[in-house]
Amino acid sequence: MKNSYINDNFIVSPLWTQAVDPQKEKKEKVVKILKIILKFTKLFIYAFLFLMGLWGCFQTMVDPTVKTSTTIGSGMEFGFPFGSTGDFRYDLTSGANNEYYAFTSTQWNISDYGPFFGLFVYPGAMLVLSIMYPLRDVWGGLDALLGIFVLLFIIRLITFLISIRSTMQSERMSEIQGKLAEINAKYKDVKKDMAMRQKKQLETQELYKKYNIKPFAMFEQMFVTMPIFLIVYRVVTILRPIKVINLFNIWALSASPLSEITSNLSNGGWVFIFFLLIIVPSQIISQKIPQILAKRRNANARALSQKGNDSAKKMRISQTVVMVVLVFVVVQSPASVGLYWFLSSLFTIAQSVIIHHYIVKRKTKGVSLEEKLRELGIK
């Protein structure tokens, strides 16, 4: 008598003999290729932006043809060709005996002032100029305010996904601090043991892989932020119509706050003290808000490793150094740069709040951030 019954019509194939779905295999190959293409595309874009930022920075320092001046009709200016509108605020013309370099609205090329001005500064300056001219007679320089606001809005819209990715990476890093602390405690006294150090490094890498953490992704925003700052800086300092504006009939956008306070204090320069009291705190707040919101989101994940504490400390120091440098630049630059800085800080605060509520909402609903990032193509 047989111990088992086998149905001839039912055949079970071992796993190793099961046929592979060719469509699935093809799809996986396509996805893999697309990921590689996306990776190298992002690498190329970031490298290009970084190099263009360096190009613009060095060109600003050494090229006399792109230097700016607070005096109208002097230095490099962007506007319409002479005689186009009949309005001296918009038509480019030099002052008497001034070194002058006209960058007109018809010069969309890289042969005159290089790729940084041709590819990046020109589109931004043209956008602001196109907004300001139809509104040229509005009160208090609101045309300049609107022009810079729209430029920043478009830039922030383009870079929003990068900001989300950077924030998500920081979020995940905060969430695994407890596990990192456990790994560091486990290998606390292995500084001279190369094998154990390698094992510790391997466990850390496995943890990063599990939570899809890419340490360098948190610095992506920096590669984009600095070139953008330089681009908008050049836009607001070379636009001729901005140089003639008194914002709210109080602050001359072509004037340097530091120069006005130190050399013209009793003759109206004192108003720039209030200008700085608005500009500088707004930027400090915009830097603190993301940190405060991150602490609220991760109130239960406070167990930081020593390495985590050191990294957080270094991050705070570097942010402080950058802040001090930017304050120095803004204080001695034309007030138009301060106006841009103020609007930028408002965008940063709004962006931080939006991302915060998005993350909290996802956590409340129990939706995996990983899944949503895949849907958005951010991961």
UniProtKB/Swiss-Prot annotation:
Oligomer and partners: Interacts with the Sec translocase complex via SecD. Specifically interacts with transmembrane segments of nascent integral membrane proteins during membrane integration.
PANTHER family in the cross-refs: CYTOCHROME C OXIDASE ASSEMBLY PROTEIN COX18, MITOCHONDRIAL (PTHR12428:SF65), OXA1 (PTHR12428)
Transmembrane segments: 36-56, 115-135, 144-164, 213-233, 235-255, 265-285, 322-342
Role of this protein: Required for the insertion and/or proper folding and/or complex formation of integral membrane proteins into the membrane. Involved in integration of membrane proteins that insert both dependently and independently of the Sec translocase complex, as well as at least some lipoproteins. Aids folding of multispanning membrane proteins.
Keywords: Cell membrane, Chaperone, Membrane, Protein transport, Transmembrane, Transmembrane helix, Transport
Molecular function (Gene Ontology), one example: membrane insertase activity
GO biological process: protein insertion into membrane; protein transport
Membrane-topology annotation of the record: Multi-pass membrane protein
Similarity comment: family membership: Belongs to the OXA1/ALB3/YidC family. Type 1 subfamily.
Gene Ontology cellular component list: plasma membrane
UniProt-annotated location(s): Cell membrane
Keyword Protein transport among UniProt keywords: yes
Keyword Cell division on entry: no
Taxonomic source organism: Malacoplasma penetrans (strain HF-2) (Mycoplasma penetrans)
The protein's name: Membrane protein insertase YidC
